[in-house]
């Protein structure tokens, strides 16, 4: 992304009651998958509601470089003409995934099942993130790392397998990115590729693979896990994909409306896949007034409308098994916890350390510089809620969109303004965050 050399700070101030109706942009996870499966399918895939954030745009560019035809046909409307399973062309230049772990890791899986060699790269944040977790299973399937930076990090050159082997793989951590990479590579292997996860992670890849014509069976595994078996070498056929609004983006106006007294907002068409709704469960346990209506399930993923009203929140304990269903939402939950009465304990957050930034440390710093008492104990985050937040701090974004948005939400309700050093990365996942929050009444300047 070119914006890493220009920073744009912003300040959020205590705002009057938020009101209005908004639809946040399309879901990021589904948008990446629609482009990648469209590129692996035969025929045309028509996507509506695609997230036009930089992360997804970078995935679209990579699919083009691998031989797919990717075109924008209208606002949030895109078509992809795919090359078929294992049909990727050799890219001429390194594939640049910018800030996006999802785009990069899912594309690695897809490339691992094609007889080509591709170099994967990204910005300084993505270059610092672990890739061994992805290439380990892909090497078991026959792909080979030709070159990588220290510790298996980007830039990394991967040679796809000529004859990929189907494997059974137990993911070492709950991660939809690892699971998806193995399944996408498994598309070109003969026989059944199986992924076993001890805790279920988001299942958009599984649902969309079936929508594109693959045969896949999901069974329960233990108390919270799943076993997913994909039959290899299907003919994927281009399909129509309707992308619902992203619950991870909806989280920001949702928490803002709970925190700013007297607020009353509506968020429409928010995806409600149960593997993504941990934040809503938690905010309701804290006493948040969140009403769901107009639930629909006609486009492959469920969605609903939410009315959110200003609420007095109380501290809660969030169990570790809930983490996969709200992994990207802990930053903004920590903000809600800071405004609650009482202590909130969020358990089992080790995966937060390997996101766009070390989100465990960054969240603690964000709260501390704004006068909130917070502690990290092992993998747990403990926030002492005092019913209000002093604010007045400058928050370091660390190339992480969710830190920037969380800090700005905090500033809308804190006693004194909260400033972030750089808002540029918000464009990776929620390009119209600032104008949308302003339309709802948020004071951002
Ligand atoms: O598969 C996906 O679309 C994603 C999976 C999660 O990452 P992990 O698989 O690393 O947990 C999440 O944090 C990311 O924003 C999107
Ligand atoms: C972790 C995230 O994304 P990614 O892994 O795709 O960079 C996120 O959007 O919060």
Swiss-Prot record:
Residues 1-25 are annotated as: Disordered. It is found in: Cytoplasm. It comes from the Bacteria. Keywords: Amino-acid biosynthesis, Aromatic amino acid biosynthesis, Cytoplasm, Transferase. Its EC number is 2.5.1.19. Phosphoenolpyruvate binds at residues 28, 101, 129, 177, 359, 402. One of its GO terms (molecular function) is 3-phosphoshikimate 1-carboxyvinyltransferase activity. One of its GO terms (cellular component) is cytoplasm. Pathway: Metabolic intermediate biosynthesis; chorismate biosynthesis; chorismate from D-erythrose 4-phosphate and phosphoenolpyruvate: step 6/7. It catalyses: 3-phosphoshikimate + phosphoenolpyruvate = 5-O-(1-carboxyvinyl)-3-phosphoshikimate + phosphate. InterPro entries: Enolpyruvate_Tfrase_dom (IPR001986), Enolpyruvate_Tfrase_sf (IPR036968), EPSP_synthase (IPR006264), EPSP_synthase_CS (IPR023193), RNA3'P_cycl/enolpyr_Trfase_a/b (IPR013792). The active site is at residue 328. It is an enzyme of class 2 (transferase). One of its GO terms (biological process) is chorismate biosynthetic process. Belongs to the EPSP synthase family. Catalyzes the transfer of the enolpyruvyl moiety of phosphoenolpyruvate (PEP) to the 5-hydroxyl of shikimate-3-phosphate (S3P) to produce enolpyruvyl shikimate-3-phosphate and inorganic phosphate. Monomer. This is 3-phosphoshikimate 1-carboxyvinyltransferase. It comes from Rhodopseudomonas palustris (strain BisB5). The gene is aroA.
